[in-house]
C-alpha cells in the first residue's frame, strides 16, 4: 500500500496544534455565532422592556429599569463589536460570557426589586431566570462544568433571594413554601434539559469537527496519492503514455471493483506510437560479468544502481531517455517524446560521456571494465505492451540495428552508422569502424560504420580528482567489488523510489548537492529524509493544510449562509441545493434518538409536579395529565422496547418498531410531534378550565375586603406557573436536536398563537388580580390607590413578553442546530465520497507499483516506516524461464499496409497480454514476470518467499521448477490459440534453468526490479540455443523434473557462449500435462 504519512491530526496524537485548531473551530462554528445570537436576542428583550416602561406613562417611575436596560444595551453593543475582533474574542471569550451572564442576572434582579414593596410575589421573574439558566447551557460558551456551575448559581441565588424576601414581608406559609418548591422544580428542569442539550451539541460538534478534519486529511492524502501516482507512473513510463494508461486503470477499477482482471475485450489496449528521426544508443559494460561474480548481493545492487544512476544523469544532461536496463546493458533514445534536431549529437555525446565515466572508474579502482557503445538513427515504435510489469520500450528494424552496432563495437569507443553520421553535421571527427568485419548482419545489410573520436582524447588529461588507484598491499587486500562499491558510492546516485519515501510529499526533501555528489563524510546508509519542519516544501505543505482547515472551519459558521452565498445550501442554510441530498438527509437515521423522548418525558414530569403543587386539583387536571402520561408511556415503551427485551427474551412487533425509531424518519417524526404536541397542550389545557368566580368586594368592611383579596390571590397565583409550564413546553421542542426545522417552526408558532390567545382572552384578566388590582387590595385602609402598580408585575404584559422571548430564542437556536446537523451530514457524505476516491487511488497505486515490482518487494519501499536502504535479496533456488517467439522477427515488417509495423506490434501485444493473464491464475501465483525483451518473455518462480526462509526445504524449492514447466506449457497453449485466431504459425522456444540468483531494484529515475546471476545467463542461453516448440533445460534441472514425474529427452552436448559445452534436455510436453502431479 502507498505510504501512510503522519498527518496533522492523527488519531491518538494530541498537541497544541490540535488544541488550537479545535479552539478555532469552536469559536468560529459555535461559540461566536451562538453568543452573537444571544446578544441580539437579549438586546431585543431590552428594547422591549424599554418600550413597555415608556408605554406605562411616566418613565421616571421606572428609572432603575430604564437605566439598567440602557446600560445592558450599551454593553451588548460593545460586545457585538468585539465579536468581530477574533484575537480579542479568543482571549476574552470566557470573560465576555461571564459579563453577558452578569448583565442578564443584574437585569433580572432589577426587575425583581423594582417597586418590590408594592406587591411581593414568590414567582417574581421565574421565567426570566429560567431564560438565563437555559441560555447558559445553549448559547453561552461555557464548558459543561462551567455551565453547571453558572446555572446552579443562577438558580440558587434566585431561590435564596426570593425566599428571604418573602419571609421578610409576610409570615412564612405553606403556600409560599410550595411556590418556592415549584420554582426549584422549574429551575431543575431548566438545568437538566440545558445540560442534555449541551451534551448533545458537544457530541455533535465533536463529530462534525472529527469528520471535517478527516475529510481535509483525506483530501490532502488524495493529493499526495495523486502526486505519488504520477511520479510512480512517470518513473516507469513517459508522460504522453502514462496518462492514458492511468485513466484506463481507474476506469477498470470503477467498473470491476478491486478485481485484478481486465475486461473481456476482443483486443487489449495498445499504447504504442510511432516516432521518426530519433537516435538509439545501446551500451554494454565489458567485463562486468566477471565483476558481478565477485560481488555480494548488496555490492551488486549498489554497483548497478550507482553506474546506471550516473548514466541516467548523463542521459538527462544530454536530453536522452533511458528505455530499459538489460542485465549490464543500457539503452536509451534521443528525440522522444518531442522530436529534437540534435538527437544524433545528443546520443554521441552521451556515449562519449559514458565511456569517460567508465574510464574514470577503471583508473580509480583498477577494475578491468570498459564501455562498448553502438548508435543508429532512424524511426521507432515506442510504448508499452502487455498487462503486467509495464516497461517502456522501443521496436523497429532500426532498434535491432542499433543493438547490432553495440555488439560489433569496440570497447571504449562509440560505434555509429552512416545514418547517424549524416545527422551529426560534422560535429565530431570519425574514423572507419569496420563493423562489417565483426558482425555478419552488418555485412549482409552492407552497413558502413564509424568510430567517433572523443575530442577530450586529444587534450592533455586534467589533474586527477578521483580516488587514487590502490597499489601494493592495499590492492591485494581489497576485492575488486569492494573497491568498485566504495568509489561508486561517492557518485551519490539517488536511490530507487526516493520520491515515494517522503512521508508528506513526493519530493524527497533532500538538500541539493552540486554536481550530484554527496559529502564523503556522511555515510549514505545513515542519511535520512530531513524533518518536514526543516524543509521549505514541508512548510508550504503545512501552510496550505492550515489554510485549508481554516477555510473549512470558516464554512462551519452558522452565520455564513445568512451572510454569503453557499455552494451547498439555499439562503439561511435550511435546505440543501441538491434535491437528492436533501431527501437523503431527511431519511438518514438518527443515533440515540430515543434519548430525546426520555428528556421530553422528564419535562413532562416537571410540569406535572408544578401542577400538583400549585394548581387546583380538579378532575380535568387528572384526566389531562393521565392521558398525556399514557401517551408518553406508550412512546417510551416503543423507544426502549429493545432495552427491555434484554430482560425478556421474547421479541415481537414492539421490538421491531423500537428498532425503527432511529432508522425510520416518518415513525420518528410522528412520535416526536405527538410527544411535543402533548406537552404543549397539557401545559395550558387546564387554564381555560379553571373556576374564575371573582368574589364581590364588601363595601366598608375591611375584614371582608381582605378575605376577598385572599380568595382572589389564590385564584391568580397559578397564572405565572402556567406561563412557566408553557415555556417548559417550548423547551421540550428544542430537545429534539435532529428534528427538521420546519416541524419545529410550525409547532412553536401554533403553540405561541394558542398561548397568546388563551392567556389574553382568559377570564382571569377581568379583575386584573395580579396587576394594579392586587396592589390596590393590599392597602391596609381598604381604599384603592390611584398609583398604578409596577408594570413588571402585570402578568398579562409579562406573560406575552416571556412567551415571545422564548419563541424567538428557540426559533433562532433551532435554526442553528438544524444547520449544524446538516453540516454534519454534509461532511460525512463528503468524507465517504473522498474516502472512496482515496481507496481508488490506493488501488491504482498498488496496481501501478505491482506492475513495477513484485508485491513482497513493493512492501520494502512503501508503508508506515521509511526504508531508504537498498533492496537486495539472494536466493538459493530460483527457476528462471525465457520464452521467445523467434518467428515474430520474420513476421515483423514495416510498410504502409501494417502502419509501419504498428499492426505487427498489436499482435505482439495480444500475445504478451494473454501470457500475462495466466499470471492471474492461482496455480501460477508463485510465478513472477520479470520483463519482456522484444518478443521474449522472462519470468521466474521462487522469488516470493519471505525473508529468512530462502533456504527452505528442497521439496518446496523444487516445486517451483514444476510450476514453471507448467507455466511454459500454458504459454504454448495460449500461443496456439492466438495462432488459430490470427491465422499464424508462431511457435514458442523456451529455456529453463534453476539455481542461485540475486534480486534487487536499481535505477532512481526509472526503478526496475531485476535478477542477476549465472542461473539467469544459462537460462537465457537455454532459450537462444533451443528449438521451436520445445522446452530446453540443463542436466541439473532435468534431474529434478524427472523426480517430479516429468519425462525429459536428452538432446546431447551443445556449445553455449561463455559456458563451453553443456548437456541439455527437452521436456516432453505431451506427457507433462498429465504427469506433473508432484506440484500438489
Swiss-Prot record:
Main location: membrane
CDD domains: CHD
GO BP terms in the entry: adenylate cyclase-activating G protein-coupled receptor signaling pathway; cAMP biosynthetic process; cellular response to ethanol; cellular response to lithium ion; intracellular signal transduction; maternal process involved in female pregnancy; negative regulation of cytokine production involved in inflammatory response; regulation of adaptive immune response
Region described as Modulates adenylate cyclase activity by modulating the binding of G(s)alpha to the high-affinity G(s)alpha binding site in 7C1a/7C2: spans on this chain: 506-584
Cofactor: Mg(2+); Mn(2+)
Keywords linked to the UniProt accession: ATP-binding, cAMP biosynthesis, Glycoprotein, Lyase, Magnesium, Manganese, Membrane, Metal-binding, Nucleotide-binding, Repeat, Transmembrane, Transmembrane helix
Keyword presence, Membrane: yes
Family matches, as PANTHER family: ADENYLATE CYCLASE TYPE 1, ADENYLATE CYCLASE TYPE 7
Protein known as: Adenylate cyclase type 7
Source organism: Homo sapiens (Human)
Amino acid at each position: 500500500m502507498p505510504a501512510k504519512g503522519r498527518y496533522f491530526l492523527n488519531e491518538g496524537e494530541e498537541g497544541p496544534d490540535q488544541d488550537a485548531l479545535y479552539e478555532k473551530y469552536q469559536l468560529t462554528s459555535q461559540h461566536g455565532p451562538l453568543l452573537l445570537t444571544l446578544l441580539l436576542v437579549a438586546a431585543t428583550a431590552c428594547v422591549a422592556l424599554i418600550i413597555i416602561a415608556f408605554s406605562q406613562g411616566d418613565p421616571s417611575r421606572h428609572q432603575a429599569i430604564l437605566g439598567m436596560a440602557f446600560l445592558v444595551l450599551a454593553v451588548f453593543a460593545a460586545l457585538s463589536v468585539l465579536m468581530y475582533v477574533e484575537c480579542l474574542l479568543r482571549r476574552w471569550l470566557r470573560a465576555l460570557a461571564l459579563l453577558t451572564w452578569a448583565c442578564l442576572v443584574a437585569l433580572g434582579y432589577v426587575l425583581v426589586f423594582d417597586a418590590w414593596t408594592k406587591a411581593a410575589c414568590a414567582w417574581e421573574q421565574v421565567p426570566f431566570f429560567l431564560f438565563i439558566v437555559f441560555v447558559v447551557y445553549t448559547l453561552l460558551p461555557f464548558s459543561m462544568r462551567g455551565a453547571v456551575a453558572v446555572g446552579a448559581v443562577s438558580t440558587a441565588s434566585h431561590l435564596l433571594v426570593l425566599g428571604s424576601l418573602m419571609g421578610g414581608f409576610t409570615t412564612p406559609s405553606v403556600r409560599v413554601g410550595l411556590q418556592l418548591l415549584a420554582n426549584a422544580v422549574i429551575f431543575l428542569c431548566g438545568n437538566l434539559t440545558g445540560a442534555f442539550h449541551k451534551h448533545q451539541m458537544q457530541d455533535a460538534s465533536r463529530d462534525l469537527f472529527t469528520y471535517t478534519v478527516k475529510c481535509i486529511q483525506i483530501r490532502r492524502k488524495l493529493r499526495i496519492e495523486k502526486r505519488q501516482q504520477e511520479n510512480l507512473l512517470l518513473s516507469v513510463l513517459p508522460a504522453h503514455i502514462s496518462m492514458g494508461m492511468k485513466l484506463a486503470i481507474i476506469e477498470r477499477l470503477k467498473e470491476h471493483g478491486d478485481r485484478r482482471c481486465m475486461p473481456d475485450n476482443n483486443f487489449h489496449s495498445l499504447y504504442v506510437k510511432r516516432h521518426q528521426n530519433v537516435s538509439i544508443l545501446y551500451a554494454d559494460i565489458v567485463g562486468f560479468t566477471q565483476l558481478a561474480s565477485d560481488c555480494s548481493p548488496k555490492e551488486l545492487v549498489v554497483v548497478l544502481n550507482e553506474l546506471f544512476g550516473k548514466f541516467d544523469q548523463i542521459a538527462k544532461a544530454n536530453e536522452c531517455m533511458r528505455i530499459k536496463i538489460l542485465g549490464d546493458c543500457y539503452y536509451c533514445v534521443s528525440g522522444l517524446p518531442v522530436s529534437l534536431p540534435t538527437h544524433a549529437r545528443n546520443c554521441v555525446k552521451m556515449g562519449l560521456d559514458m565511456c569517460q565515466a567508465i574510464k574514470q572508474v577503471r583508473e580509480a579502482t583498477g577494475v578491468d571494465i570498459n564501455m562498448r557503445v553502438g548508435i543508429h538513427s532512424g524511426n521507432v515504435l515506442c510504448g508499452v505492451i502487455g498487462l503486467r510489469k509495464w516497461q517502456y520500450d522501443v521496436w523497429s528494424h532500426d532498434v535491432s540495428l542499433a543493438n547490432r552496432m553495440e555488439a560489433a563495437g569496440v570497447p571504449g569507443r562509440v560505434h555509429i552508422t552512416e545514418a547517424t553520421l549524416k545527422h551529426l553535421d560534422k560535429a565530431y571527427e570519425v574514423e572507419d569502424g569496420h563493423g562489417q568485419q565483426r558482425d555478419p548482419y552488418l555485412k549482409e545489410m552492407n552497413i558502413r560504420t564509424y568510430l567517433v573520436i572523443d575530442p577530450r582524447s586529444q587534450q592533455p588529461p586534467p589533474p586527477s580528482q578521483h580516488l587514487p588507484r590502490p597499489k601494493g598491499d592495499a590492492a591485494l587486500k581489497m576485492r575488486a567489488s569492494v573497491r568498485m562499491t566504495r568509489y561508486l558510492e561517492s557518485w551519490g546516485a539517488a536511490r530507487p523510489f526516493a520520491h515515494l519515501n517522503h512521508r508528506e510529499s513526493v519530493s524527497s526533501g533532500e538538500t541539493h548537492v552540486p554536481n550530484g555528489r554527496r559529502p564523503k563524510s556522511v555515510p549514505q546508509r545513515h542519511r535520512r529524509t530531513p524533518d518536514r519542519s526543516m524543509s521549505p516544501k514541508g512548510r508550504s505543505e503545512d501552510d496550505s493544510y492550515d489554510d485549508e482547515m481554516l477555510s473549512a472551519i470558516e464554512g462551519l459558521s452558522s452565520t455564513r449562509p445568512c451572510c454569503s452565498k453557499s455552494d451547498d445550501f439555499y439562503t439561511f442554510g435550511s435546505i440543501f441545493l441538491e434535491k437528492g441530498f436533501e431527501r437523503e438527509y431527511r431519511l438518514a437515521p438518527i443515533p440515540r434518538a430515543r434519548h430525546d423522548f426520555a428528556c421530553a418525558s422528564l419535562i413532562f414530569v416537571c410540569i406535572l409536579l408544578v401542577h400538583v403543587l400549585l394548581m387546583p386539583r380538579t378532575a380535568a387536571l387528572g384526566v389531562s395529565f393521565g392521558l398525556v402520561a399514557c401517551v408518553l408511556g406508550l412512546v417510551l415503551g416503543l423507544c426502549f422496547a429493545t432495552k427491555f427485551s434484554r430482560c425478556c427474551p421474547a421479541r415481537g412487533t414492539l421490538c421491531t418498531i423500537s428498532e425503527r425509531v432511529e432508522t425510520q424518519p416518518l415513525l420518528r417524526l410522528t412520535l416526536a410531534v405527538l410527544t411535543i404536541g402533548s406537552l404543549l397542550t397539557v401545559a395550558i389545557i387546564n387554564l381555560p378550565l379553571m373556576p374564575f368566580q371573582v368574589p364581590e368586594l364588601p363595601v366598608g368592611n375591611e375584614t371582608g375586603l381582605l378575605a376577598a383579596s385572599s380568595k382572589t390571590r389564590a385564584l391568580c397565583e397559578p397564572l405565572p406557573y402556567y406561563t412557566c409550564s408553557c415555556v417548559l413546553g417550548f423547551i421540550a421542542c428544542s430537545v429534539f436536536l435532529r428534528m427538521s426545522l420546519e416541524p419545529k417552526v410550525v409547532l412553536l408558532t401554533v403553540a405561541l398563537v394558542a398561548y397568546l390567545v388563551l392567556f389574553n382572552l382568559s377570564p382571569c384578566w377581568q379583575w386584573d388580580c395580579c396587576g394594579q388590582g392586587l396592589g390596590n387590595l393590599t392597602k391596609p385602609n381598604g381604599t384603592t390607590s390611584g398609583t398604578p402598580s409596577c408594570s413588571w408585575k402585570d402578568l398579562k404584559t409579562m406573560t406575552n413578553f416571556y412567551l415571545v422571548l422564548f419563541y424567538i430564542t428557540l426559533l433562532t437556536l433551532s435554526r442553528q442546530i438544524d444547520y449544524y446537523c446538516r453540516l454534519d451530514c454534509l461532511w460525512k457524505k463528503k468524507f465517504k465520497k473522498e474516502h472512496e476516491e482515496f481507496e481508488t487511488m490506493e488501488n491504482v497505486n498498488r496496481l501501478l507499483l505491482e506492475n513495477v515490482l513484485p508485491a513482497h518487494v513493493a512492501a520494502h519501499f512503501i508503508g508506515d516506516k521509511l526504508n531508504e536502504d537498498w533492496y537486495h535479496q539472494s536466493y538459493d533456488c530460483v527457476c528462471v524461464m525465457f520464452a521467445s517467439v523467434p518467428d515474430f522477427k520474420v513476421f515483423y515488417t514495416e510498410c504502409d499496409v501494417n502502419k509501419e509495423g504498428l499492426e505487427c506490434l498489436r499482435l505482439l501485444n495480444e500475445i504478451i497480454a494473454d501470457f500475462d493473464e495466466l499470471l492471474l491464475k492461482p496455480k501460477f501465483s508463485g510465478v513472477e514476470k520479470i520483463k519482456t525483451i522484444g518478443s521474449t518473455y522472462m519470468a521466474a518462480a521462487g522469488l516470493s518467499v519471505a525473508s529468512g526462509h530462502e533456504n527452505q526445504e528442497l521439496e518446496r524449492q523444487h516445486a517451483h521448477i514444476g510450476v514453471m514447466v507448467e507455466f511454459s506449457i500454458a504459454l504454448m497453449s495460449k500461443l496456439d490459440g492466438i495462432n488459430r485466431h490470427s491465422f499464424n504459425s508462431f511457435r514458442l522456444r523456451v529455456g529453463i534453468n534453476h539455481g542461485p540468483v540475486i534480486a534487487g531494484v536499481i535505477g532512481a529515475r526509472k526503478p526496475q526490479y531485476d535478477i542477476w546471476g549465472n542461473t539467469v545467463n544459462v537460462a537465457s542461453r537455454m532459450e537462444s540455443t533451443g528449438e521451436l516448440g520445445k522446452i530446453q533445460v540443463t542436466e541439473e534441472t532435468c534431474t529434478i523434473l524427472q523426480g517430479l514425474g516429468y519425462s525429459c529427452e536428452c538432446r546431447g552436448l551443445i556449445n553455449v557462449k561463455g559456458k563451453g559445452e553443456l548437456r541439455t534436455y527437452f521436456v516432453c510436453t505431451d506427457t507433462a500435462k498429465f504427469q506433473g502431479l508432484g506440484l500438489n
